[in-house]
Amino acid sequence: MARAMIGGMLEKGIAKPEEILGSAKTQATLDAVSEKYGICVSGSNREIAEKADILILAVKPQMLAGVIEEIRDGVRQDELILSIAAGKTIAWIEEALGGNLKVVRCMPNTPAMVGEGCSGVCRNERVSDEEMERCMTLARSFGMAQEIPEKLIDAVGAVSGSSPAFVFMFMEALADAGVKAGMTRSQAYRFTAQAVLGSAKLMLATGKHPGELKDMVCSPGGTTIEGVQALEEMGLRASVMKAVDVCVEKTRKL
């Protein structure tokens, strides 16, 4: 995810390579990122905390406590802290860093890797509107971003953050069905991906309810409604809702 954020910032001209300083767990990763993006790198998280205007904590929630232990004494009260770690609340981050800090949380998703991400962003009361707009501009560099209250961020993380995995499972199954019906594997993947992409664009462009768009495809007595009935009988909706429920529950335990 950090690479997607770096790529978006550079592509949209939000920052120059020399204005970005990054760290990683391994020297190999540092070398690869430096070579690809031309950014500055450091083996010290503390150094980055001391120098940053916006300190981006682009680590998994299980790693965040260890990173904070390294940077706590280097964080300044005038810098923005932007965390993408799921489940770690603003209050948790403030307490862990031991100060009255400006904290923003951002929940992006993997489509950010191709500039089509979807991010929910929230802040504490110390972050000004101008500072929040800087963070929103950053988030928009790799997709859509919307400010939300923190109480919704776990739901957003499940609906937009985890859902690409669910969509890919659906696409894989759809492609397998196409192969079973005689399509080549490459054909099945291509047609499936385009169908999902086009459907998403249609929903965004028209603003229509997904149920209405579904009904537009289902002709009376036609083939599609037969498939819809099969999905209903197998509990598609309930399965999807349950998947989101358990994702939210797990996030709150992190």
Q: What are the roles of these predicted feature ranges?
A:
Residues 193-254:
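NAD(P)-dependent Rossmann-like dehydrogenase/reductase catalytic/cofactor-binding core
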